[in-house]
Regions:
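Glycine-rich phosphate- or other oxyanion-binding loops that anchor nucleotides, phosphorylated ligands
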Residues: 1-136
Length: 136
């Protein structure tokens, strides 16, 4: 979504974007248009993140199923996508979850001069096929 707004490069973490694209082997039209990386506001992270919270990178996917590495009855363009995402590391951080909104919210907030961060609770671990059904 952020690729459609002026000022996108000014608010994105361009070195992380390049590193992720190289790691995934994405180029041209394979799998996704140019992804964008938005850092959470550091002040808000320090205010919210407790010592018992896992800090990591959230991948905000551009859709359900295929963009999140889930195969239906149609083969994925990159069947190793989840494996590549799981092995990615940048400045000591790893990708800890998939969802669809965080980067858009953080990016739009930053473009408008606001501070934003997200705190995500892991409900389903698709890799080991477990879900937390008792969360509140």
């Amino acid at each position: 979504m952020l690729n459609f707004y002026e000022g996108r490069n000014a608010v994105c973490d361009l070195p992380l974007e390049r590193t992720l694209l190289n790691h995934l082997g994405w180029s041209g039209n394979l799998c996704a248009p140019a992804p964008y990386v938005i850092d959470a506001h550091p002040e808000l992270i320090e205010r919210i993140a407790a010592d018992d919270m896992v800090r990591g990178i959230t991948v905000a996917c551009g859709g359900f199923f295929g963009p999140q590495g889930r195969q239906l009855r149609i083969p994925l363009a990159d069947p190793r996508q989840n494996e590549k995402i799981e092995s990615f590391s940048y400045n000591g951080l790893q990708i800890t979850n998939f969802e669809m909104e965080s980067s858009a919210l953080a990016g739009l907030a930053r473009l408008m001069g606001h501070k934003a961060t997200t705190c995500c609770m892991v409900i389903a671990n698709r890799l080991i096929k477990e879900a937390n059904t008792g969360y509140k």
